[in-house]
Amino acid sequence: MHELAQVKSARGKFVERKYLAMLDTPLESSGTLAYAAPGRLEKHMLAPREESLILDGDTLIIENKRTGKRRSLTLQENPVVWGFAEGIRSTLNGDLATLRRFYKVALEGDFRAWRLRLEPTEPRMRQAAAEIRLGGSGTWVNRIEILEAGGDRSETVITREPS
């Protein structure tokens, strides 16, 4: 976790697949991700529609490019969203103390190939997600998997963009 805390910024491309019990094939989306320490994370979905999620401090902004609609949420007023956001952001920050505030944390592997399992401790968040799994190599997070409480799941694979 200490090494992750040293990363000041990172950029990558993602492909996310959502596996829903009611569908035979996964839903797929793709786009770009950008991180700037300590608290800014941007997810720009480019396909199948253009949408942006920007986490900056304690605010999450959701913007639909097609409709022009923009919504802003304060994390502390939305505990489930806050928990999800901190699961990703605190991992990128190497902030184990904050992770433990929201999750039971288990780290496996070594620096070259690691896996972090996060089990929500907050009851409302447990109703949404059973577990979040992040995997990486060195200071790069290359995989995020969210296992929802109802059995659906999403897998996100992240490839690094050259700086």
Q: What are the language-model segments listed below?
A:
Residues 13-15, 32-34, 44, 117-119, ...:
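Residue-level recognition of well-ordered beta-strand positions that form the cores
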Residues 32-83, 154:
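An acidic-aromatic
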Residues 25-31, 131, 152:
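Amphipathic hydrophobic-ligand
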Residues 1-19, 24-26, 40, 64-121, ...:
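Flexible, processing/modification-adjacent segments and terminal tails
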Residues 60-62, 70, 80-81, 88-90, ...:
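Short, charged/polar low-complexity linear motifs in solvent-exposed/disordered segments
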Residues 96-163:
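Gly/Pro-enriched, hydrophobic low-complexity segments
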